[in-house]
Amino acid sequence: MYKILLADDERIILDGMAGIIEWESLGASLIGKAQNGHEAYEKIVHKQPHIVITDVKMPGMDGLELIKKVSAVSPSVQFIVLSGFGEFEYAKEAMKYGVKHYLLKPCNEQQIISSLEEIIAELKRQDVHKKKTAHLKHELDHIRSFAADQYLEGLIAGVAQLSPPPSLAGKKIRLLILKGEQSIDAAAREALGSALTAVCSSGEWTVLAVEENAAEKVAEVFADRKMAISQAGELRHAGQLFRDTAEASGDLHGSAVISKMIRLIADELGNPNLSLKWAAKDMLFMNPDYLGKLFKQETGEKFSQYVTRVRLEHAMKQMKIRRDVSVSEIAEEIGFGDNPKYFSLVFKKYTGLTPSEFRRKQGGASAG
């Protein structure tokens, strides 16, 4: 049903048009009436009619002002303009805004119906065209998606390809590698949207190519799946990205990942930003929740507990052999930043002694 709105300051004309025309037989419905331009505009904005039949002369805001204002916000709205004799200048002005139907008062029922039929026929043609265009776009997207999937599969399998599909040439991506041949459901595809470039299966893995800046979105969508994410690179290098990531991740839940995390902790011990989230997102490109569970499973400790323990054991060692170095310097070196008081609290909780007491017990002077 096409929605119609009437606007005329003369109540008799307004009610007459509303009652005399059989709207449903035209495939239309009358959604409202207005007696001035301001009221008509408000109803157009809120009810979104397809067609507005309006008088030219109305109080407050006339028909031409109404057409101008509506054209700026809803250019698809079609108008039928009613005017009195000798108002041709109004007609010329209305035509500038695409108005094709201009009826001279007094007009009869058939004239209005004829104008409505012409507009509705045109709207139907537009609807058919939109549907055809949407269908063709869907088909084209499907073809492009299939081509992208085939291209990715060839790269992962090591099959030489002359060139990628034109839409993917030079595209930067990350590979998301999921353990197991699991299909990507419609909800996941919809959540990733345009960030999803291609999908394929390779042995025991499902591989997705996603836009390089989509790592966070991917982690959210697949939070409950065992996965690894590659470094960023061009799609044409997907084969190497896949091999590097699969090798580094082992079976995506084995000790290879944890070994990499432990090496990372040792290398970044002095980094105050060292955290599970930072390591997962910026260094390992994996889901932090999954990585945290995996770390606890493999080591028996939470990531944060492990980091604190390693830092404190390193601090104790340094306090023994570097007796001339202050506690605050050692605290900063192992990632506690410029916060020696917090270091002292953590140190005492772990050892039962303050740093000064620990040093005295070791037989060394206390450096501040």
Swiss-Prot record:
Record key words, sorted: Cytoplasm, DNA-binding, Phosphoprotein, Transcription, Transcription regulation, Two-component regulatory system
Domain HTH araC/xylS-type: residue ranges: 259-361
Residue ranges occupied by any Response regulatory domain in the UniProt entry: 3-120
Domain of life: Bacteria
Gene Ontology terms: biological process: phosphorelay signal transduction system
Modification 4-aspartylphosphate occurs at: 55
SUPFAM superfamilies referenced in this protein's UniProt entry, alphabetically: CheY-like (SSF52172), Homeodomain-like (SSF46689)
Entry's Gene Ontology molecular function annotations: DNA-binding transcription factor activity; sequence-specific DNA binding
InterPro entries: CheY-like_superfamily, Homeodomain-like_sf, HptR, HTH_AraC, Sig_transdc_resp-reg_receiver
Xref: Gene3D superfamilies: 3.40.50.2300, Homeodomain-like
Post-translational modification: Phosphorylated by YesM.
Reported function: Member of the two-component regulatory system YesM/YesN.
Name of the protein described by the UniProt record: Uncharacterized transcriptional regulatory protein YesN
Gene coding for it: yesN
